[in-house]
A protein has these predicted regions:
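Short alpha-helix
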Residues: 184-200
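Conserved class I S-adenosyl-L-methionine
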Residues: 2-60
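Class I SAM-dependent methyltransferase SAM/SAH-binding core
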Residues: 67, 73-120
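Short conserved loop adjoining the S-adenosyl-L-methionine
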Residues: 122-127
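A short SAM/SAH-binding and catalytic strip from SAM-dependent methyltransferases
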Residues: 131-142
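A short, conserved alpha-helix within the catalytic core of class I
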Residues: 141-151
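Short, glycine-/aromatic-enriched active-site segment of Class I SAM-dependent methyltransferases
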Residues: 164-184
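Conserved beta-strand signature within the Rossmann-like core of class I S-adenosyl-L-methionine
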Residues: 156-164
Length: 221
């Protein structure tokens, strides 16, 4: 287990996700009342779309190994493992990893999954992966480049990432809501993201707009 060197901001974010882990996971399980499920489908449609996008790319590219950076409660990890992939999930929120381990055990894929409690910036590993994904991650990163540079070293072939778009109606709402909860949040222009990816050593293959998100497929250069 690596020694963590959390900044005050990353500690705030980890504490936020620890506190809401079961509530967040319920977005995927649907274990909510009828009204809440309906609101999720309406207001968080792109969360389901980004999941489908990653699985579609995985089915096309068929990676043998995947690293999920900011894996949260393990929904992507478990679904990728069901496809026969060896998956490593990295997250710095302990309660999220507890849920992720429970999920992979309950779905019978734990033997193909492992988890690391760490900020990817602090993770000490010699491993690399056919595909790396970072979904629902860049919302909470003030300076993407250092983490992108680490991710580039982890990536043999393909990197998939989803970035919240600047200038949307949801941006203002999320800023207010998350500030009240003590969690910083960030939004991005497409050109900014392209520049960061290129600086880190990736070549952008495609960018799809899914609701409030930019979803980038990039290749290691």
């Amino acid at each position: 287990m690596p020694v963590e060197t959390k900044t005050d901001e990353s500690r705030q974010i980890a504490q936020y996700w620890d506190a809401i882990a079961p509530e967040f996971d319920a977005i995927y399980t649907g274990k909510k009342n009828f009204v809440s499920r309906g609101l999720d489908r309406l207001l968080r449609k792109d969360m389901y779309q980004r999941f489908e996008w990653v699985m579609r790319k995985a089915d096309e590219l068929r990676p043998a190994t995947v690293c999920d950076v900011g894996c949260g409660s393990g929904r992507f990890v478990s679904s990728l493992a069901k496809r026969g992939t060896q998956v490593t999930g990295v997250d710095f929120a302990p309660q999220m990893l507890t849920l992720a381990r429970q999920l992979t055990e309950s779905e019978g894929v734990a033997s193909r999954c492992k988890f690391e409690l760490s900020d990817v910036l602090d993770w000490k590993t010699n491993e690399s992966f056919d595909m790396v994904i970072a979904i629902g991650f860049w919302d909470y990163v003030a300076d993407p480049l250092p983490r992108l540079q680490v991710i580039r070293k982890l990536t043999k072939q393909t990197f998939l990432s989803a970035w919240p778009r600047a200038g949307t109606m949801r941006m203002a709402i999320r800023k207010v809501r998350l500030k009240a909860a003590g969690c910083p949040v960030y939004f991005w222009e497409r050109k900014q993201v392209e520049n960061y990816l290129q600086q880190a050593g990736f070549r952008v293959q495609s960018c799809e707009i899914l609701g409030q998100l930019y979803c980038f497929e990039a290749k290691s250069v």
